[in-house]
Amino acid sequence: MILTKNSNEKKPLKKGLFIVFEGIDGAGKTSILKQLLEVLKEPKLVNKIFLTREPGGKNNNAAEMIREFFLKNLEVFDPLTLAYLYASSRAEHVKKTINPHLEKDHIVISDRFVHSSYIYQGIVQNQSLDVIYQINQQAIGELEIDYVFYFDVNVNNALNRMKNRFDNTNAFDSQNKQFYEKLLKQYPSVFKVYNQPKKIIFIDANKNENEVLCEVKEQLLKIFKEHKYI
């Protein structure tokens, strides 16, 4: 029996809003994230939204150094070692980037966070999810995710996008179709058990990019209004 890794104890209200985009490679979340500041032009949101990504972190030299080191050497590490390396980068990201922005009441939107480790370092590489949880709790402390946007895409669409994109790919992008099918089956269940966000928003990422961008924008504006940012 797997116990839900969430505490029911009441914690002090934190400032800011923490939103995470999750999904397999090729789901399109990174492309959408890069366009958000162009489409979210509400005056009250100026200087309020901070976009970042994992592994690593925007304007975070330590997290980026760790990222660069292990992404260049993925094949040489034991899976458990990789889990620690990802968590080490995440610890730097949380302590030096995410938490400081939340303390300023900013809206932090991250391309990937802890659930990616449960999928990639846990399920895919046959590591205990409880161990992955313990490692990452040291990294993130009491930080909680407010919203997860899960970009749901079928494997064929994801693989086609990866083949057509022009940026450099890492070793995970070269895995076969079965690899990504395994990820798709496990993602939703992981959200329910570990570091459960306050709300999960499913995005149909099989649509064209403009349609997905409009849907994400609409959902985000609803959230910002609910939390009185606009």
UniProtKB/Swiss-Prot annotation:
Question: What does this protein do, in the record's words?
Answer: Phosphorylation of dTMP to form dTDP in both de novo and salvage pathways of dTTP synthesis.
Protein's UniProt name: Thymidylate kinase
Pfam families recorded: Thymidylate_kin
Q: What family does this belong to?
A: Belongs to the thymidylate kinase family.
Question: Any keyword Kinase?
Answer: yes
Keyword S-adenosyl-L-methionine present in the record's keywords: the answer is no
Q: Which reaction does it catalyse?
A: dTMP + ATP = dTDP + ADP
Matches recorded under CDD domains: TMPK (cd01672)
Q: Which Gene3D superfamilies match?
A: P-loop containing nucleotide triphosphate hydrolases
Q: What is its EC number?
A: 2.7.4.9
